[in-house]
Amino acid sequence: MVPDTPNPLDILLPDRHPQPDFFICDVADAVLKDLMPTMEHPFYALSKKPETMIRRYAHNGHWLEVIPSVKGQATIYDKDILIYAVSQIMHKVNQGERVDRRLRFSPRELLIFVNRGTGGKDYEAFVEALERLMGTVIKTNITTHSDGSPVPLGEEEDIGLFHLIESAHVRRKNGAQDGRILWAEIQISEWIFNSIRRKKVLTLHRDYFRLRKPIERRVYEIARKCCGSQPTHKVGLENLLKRTGARMSIKRFRHVVRDLAKHDHLPDYSVSFEEDGDNVVFISRGTVISSNVVDAAKPTQIIRLKSDTYHEARLAAPGWDVYALEQEWRDWITEAPKNPDGAFIGFCRKIFERRGRP
């Protein structure tokens, strides 16, 4: 008999390496990390087909242009390499080791870490991913200054251009073009390294690599960044689609969200869709603990705003996503204000005065 309710385990990819090899146990123990800026904004293509057109994205004063090479824009699957690199570097930082932008590693260890196969085609796909990561140029005003200066957008604008990976080296056995890959070395960009040094990273669930569809990965990233360890987070469907960077109709995306709600297989969060308001609600499963959230111990992260405050914020900043503004406000303030609700509304009013409608 076929069960009426799909098994979430069947919806996820199989765990290809449930018992990691002995020689990579130190790698498997590294906590899975991702960069906050790339989780919140669509830096990566969601299609496996090469995308060679320049793409521009703008949201709440932040903007970025993604300029691909002739081999196509780096994809969300190529990003696995950077997630691995960030995880390894953060692991070393937490162990008190010195780190820099260069990382040498075994591609086999990486493939196991990201739940890939370890056949010949998987190694060749790894090399192709390096080429796309090196070829993709990011132009953006989303800064990761190493000095940590809290300059609100609107007062100054700092535009950066960088490659996701600045250089890469692959060593093959016997030096042959089709020889077995022995090791690889990459140098990440200063922009990414600054995020690591400032610990602008979040822990991801290991089942992230078991999500089958690129859009599911992207929705999880947004939920992880915006909801964090909060009980819930609500976002409009149209706004969520924009933030994913997906090239699909709102009708198609609505179907995607309904499937996520129906099958309930997203790691860390359940998904609820409000038909009346066309809103998506992420509900924490309680698997994300506050110690995993950057700056979670700060009072600014545990402030609770009144429900009426969001209505007043919408009036203060017409057209803006007040939930996104709330996150920006929390990141900007350094201590809990005496009147959080009034302070947040004032922040929204200033944003509207400086930036106008989005």
Which sequence ranges carry the predicted segments?
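Charged, alpha-helix-forming regions
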Residues: M1-A313, Q327, D331-P358
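Electrostatic, structured charged patches in enzyme active sites and in nucleic-acid/phosphate-binding
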Residues: W320
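Short, surface-exposed alpha-helical recognition segments that flank or form part
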Residues: A317
